[in-house]
């Protein structure tokens, strides 16, 4: 069965069956966009450092993350705000201290691969 969309059906292919397999592998455009957004979050070295620290150690407070990454507290807070808005991390308040942790299972899986290579 060919999955070539009608707007591309008139174009010549060399390996038509592979083109159909490639279209199936790409899948839903919304899912591709969601993964691209995740990768964009991970593309910033400072955000990636924060996520690697959280993935390896578990929940940490902003000030502890700042010391671990060499960032200042406001920069850590801003990065965590972005990661929280994207659903990648969540904060758990304990008194006046908020400790953050990675909650996105897909991102955690990617971080596991990154950490294993280091």
What would you call each of these model-derived segments?
Residues 1-42, 109, 114:
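N-terminal leader segment of winged-helix/HTH proteins
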Residues 97, 103, 110-118:
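Short, charged, intrinsically disordered terminal tails
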Residues 25, 29, 33-72, 94, ...:
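N-terminal helix-turn-helix DNA-binding core of bacterial DNA-binding proteins
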